[in-house]
A protein has these predicted regions:
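Surface-exposed, low-hydrophobicity beta-strand/loop segments enriched in small/polar/acidic residues
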Residues: 5-8, 12-161
Length: 161
């Protein structure tokens, strides 16, 4: 059945509907992490044309070590091609407790790098596969381990032409 293309109530109607019907893609690795995750994990398959607009990464515990700072680097791919020009990074900061951290800009956490979406590589089509990875670097036996790395990939639809 062909997709209905209009007339629509407004120029941003598809975005409004997608905001309700297209929740963000989400992924989590449950538990403590002290080694690379071992590859990419599927976030889902796109059911509409769209683009990635924001990526937020979080950990329930950022880890702690006196040497070799625990650091987690995230990445997002569309059909195997990275969609980020700068991946989000969460790192322990000396003197801080092993605490929850997020790259959400409003949180104001320290030791983080916010994701920058590559506008030349962020579009996806129906059937495209979105995936993510998490890579840990730092001490193999930290005082506190990094735990529960999670990612939220927010998208907007691309209106029909």
């Amino acid at each position: 059945m062909p997709k209905y293309t209009g007339p629509l109530p407004g120029s941003d109607f598809a975005r409004q509907v997608a905001g309700v019907n297209l929740p963000p893609f989400r992924g989590t690795i449950s538990g403590e992490v002290v080694a690379a995750s071992g590859g990419y994990f599927t976030l889902g398959v796109a059911n509409i044309r769209g683009k990635i607009v924001r990526v937020v990464a979080s950990v329930s515990t950022a880890g702690k070590a006196d040497s070799q700072v625990p650091t987690g680097t995230f990445n997002v791919r569309i059909n195997g091609t990275t969609a980020l020009s700068t991946p989000p990074v969460i790192a322990h900061v000396s003197g801080e407790a092993a605490q929850h951290k997020t790259t959400w800009s409003e949180a104001g956490d320290t030791g983080i790098t916010q994701a920058v979406v590559n506008n030349a590589a962020c579009d996806f089509g129906v059937g495209d596969i979105l995936s993510w990875s998490f890579a840990y670097t730092g001490s193999d036996s930290p005082t506190a381990k990094m735990a529960n790395p999670s990612i939220v990939v927010e998208t907007d639809p691309i209106p029909p032409v």
